[in-house]
Design a protein with these regions (language model features):
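Basic, often amphipathic N-terminal segments
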Residues: 1-87, 111-173, 191-198
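Short beta-strand element of the conserved SAM-dependent methyltransferase core
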Residues: 16, 103-105, 184
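A short small-residue
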Residues: 50, 99-102
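Short loop/turn segments at strand-loop or loop-helix junctions that form parts
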Residues: 54, 93, 105
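Glycine-rich beta-strand-turn "strand-cap" elements at beta-sheet edges
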Residues: 89-98, 177-194
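Short histidine-centered catalytic/ligand-binding loop motif
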Residues: 101-111
């Protein structure tokens, strides 16, 4: 008999990671919003700024296969990007369901096309082996590339964030950020398992 408190699988993400300068600018923005809306989930859980390409469920014993698949994807991603990483252009702030505030990738930019290509390749490699996670929101047909600024917001916190972002002239968000690596991470608790630099 299986213990009902023991999950059958864990959720893992494959994400794009920013270089040190870009990551710090995004952390500074996350901290400022955390002060405004009184929600510091991202800071408290030490989740570095990133763009999630995909989320997948895997059984506990599947970690070696997951890491091998990640390594194969990282090699292909380097080829797609010419081994140079990616300068990601942002198009401004947006939100999901009044619970997440994020910086969206600029839709009419070359970097957006590269992101969509990476997302499609990732799912071609991972879906035959692993189940899509996070309510399938990262599947190519549903995915909107973004870097989260605040998550798990209550309605009152979301209103504070939205009001602040709509009127804060001194709050400057980055227009672009350098993507320097890929990471494979366990979601709960957030734990980076491996990283592949471009």
């Amino acid at each position: 008999m299986q213990n009902i408190l023991t999950p059958k699988h864990s959720t893992y993400t494959v994400s794009l990671c920013f270089d040190g300068g870009a990551a710090q600018r995004l952390v500074d923005a996350q901290k400022r919003l955390a002060q405004i809306c009184r929600n510091n989930f991202l800071i408290e859980h030490s989740v570095p700024p990133h763009v999630t390409l995909g989320a997948f469920h895997a059984e506990p014993g599947a970690l070696p296969k997951l890491q091998k698949t990640f390594d194969g994807f990282a090699k292909e991603a380097r080829e797609v990007l010419g081994g140079n990483g990616l300068d990601l252009e942002f198009g401004g702030t947006d939100s999901f369901l009044d619970k997440v505030v994020f910086l969206a990738a600029k839709k009419d930019s070359p970097s957006f096309v590269s992101l969509k290509t990476l997302n499609e390749i990732l799912h071609q490699k991972f879906l035959p082996l692993f189940e899509a996670g996070s309510n399938k929101n990262y599947l190519p047909e549903r995915w909107l590339p973004h870097a989260a600024l605040a998550v798990k917001l209550r309605p009152d916190q979301f209103k504070k964030c939205a009001a602040f972002l709509g009127h804060a002239s001194d709050f400057v968000l980055p227009q672009s950020a350098r993507v320097a690596a890929l990471s494979l991470a366990l979601c709960k608790p957030y734990t980076e398992l491996c990283r592949a630099a471009f």
